[in-house]
Amino acid sequence: MKKLGIFGNAVVLTLVFCVFLFAFIQCDNGTTSIYEGITVVCLGDSLTAGHGATTPGLVDRSKSYPAYLQNKINIPVINAGISGNTTTQGLFRVDAQVLSQNPQIVIINLGANDFFQRIPVTTTRDNLQNIINKVNDGNRKIYLVKFYTEEIAMELFDVFGVTDYDFQAIIDQYDELFDSLVSENDVTLIENIWCGVWGIHMSDPVHPDAEGYEIMANNIFNVLQPYLQANDLLK
């Protein structure tokens, strides 16, 4: 009986130790336990995925703008970027790759590939509106990234050799697209993501290098910071 008692105590102590160890591992993940289960999800294309960060033509998520944001935020930042995605493909992924992550914050950075592929602006707008509708539950903070400036858009036409296009008309349509989405929905616009990046820290004509993605992350963070600070989500 004495031996059985010693054995039983050992089992109990072992179980207690395992419970504490499991709790420690669960909490020791760079997040604060009070926020466990909520995330930031970055839905996007190659600019979110980290295309060209370290090697031109290849994706390196460890040097993407979501990875750099993670250094500043105390809840997980999920990179839901896939190179080449249009808004149609992004919309298709919302349920499986955004809502499934229980996001508190969603950053939508889509539209560049629609622009390159000359997808009708009305289609792009409808897709972005449907993405917002799916994501918006009344509690989530939603950010919409404007992927261009007028000057950059003009340069992109040159990069892709586009000549049979009314440049100013298409830029005006995209400006109206973003303005209307922001005015009609509870979303915050992120502009000037290319500040300090475009033409300086680039791996190819349209993608940043690692340093460029870090600067881009800082540009995005500057817009997120008031909300993050107000909700105690900063590291």
Regions found by a protein language model. Name each.
Residues 51-52, 88, 117:
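Short N-terminal helix/helix-N-cap motif within the alpha/beta-hydrolase-1
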Residues 48-49, 84, 114, 149:
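Active-site micro-motifs of SAM-dependent methyltransferase domains
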Residues 2-13:
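Bacterial N-terminal signal peptides that target proteins for export
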